[in-house]
Amino acid sequence: MREVVLDTETTGLSPKNGDRLVEIGCVELENHVPTGEVFHCYINPERDMPAEAEAVHGLTAEFLADKPVFSEVASSFLEFVGSSPLVIHNSAFDLGFLNSELEALGKCNIPNSQAIDTVSLARSKYPGAPASLDALCRRFSIDNSRRSKHGALLDAELLAEVYLELRGGKQPGLGLTEGKAIKSNPEIELHSAKRPPRAHSPTKEELIAHSALVKKLQNPLWNRQG
C-alpha cells in the first residue's frame, strides 16, 4: 500500500492571517517502508519572513526570493501525492495551509479523510505521554541529531521512522513489492532454539505407547522398498 509522509514549513501559524507555505517535504512509503522517492521544494511566499518563523526553520526572505511560487509547484506536488493516504504530524495545520494555497488557485481541497494524523495515533497508543516529533523520536530511539531547526523534508523522513514504529515496528522482509526494491531491507536471519539432551531413558510405559503408535501408522517410510 502506498502512503506519503508529508510536512510543511510556513511563515506563521494561520493562513487566515496571511501566512504562507515556504517548504514542502514528502516521503513515499510502500507498506509503511520508505521507497527512496521524495518530493521536496522551497516556495517563495511573496511576503516577508517574521523573525519568530525564521527562528523555527531558519529560512530567510533572501533565501526564498528566487524560489518558485506555489502556483509553479502545485501540479507536481499534487501528482506526487495523488490519492494516497497522507501521513502528517498534526494534519489540521498542514492541510489548512495546503488547502488555502490550493483554493487560491481554484483547485480542489485535499480532504481530511485522506490524512493519517500521527499526533492522534501517538496519543491513542500512549495516553498522557508527550506526542511531539522530538518526543516520539526519543521514545523510539530514532536519531534526530540533525534536527537543530525544523525542515520539511528532514521532518518527513523522521516522521516516516516514527510512523513505522507506531504501526508496530520494523519487520525485515515485509514491504517488498513486485518490481520495486525497498531500500534498507536487511537480510532475514532464522534461528531455532536448541533443546537440551534428554537426561534419562524412556520409561516402560513410554516404550509401550510408542510401539502402539508405530503399529497404527499406514505404510511407514522405513517399511517401503527402494
Give residue spans per PLM region.
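Conserved non-catalytic scaffold segment of RNase H-like nuclease domains
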Residues: M1-S113, R123-P127, A135-K149
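Alpha-helix initiation and N-capping motif
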Residues: A74, P130-L133, L207-H210
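Short, well-ordered coil↔helix boundary/capping segments
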Residues: P127, H150-L153, S201-K204
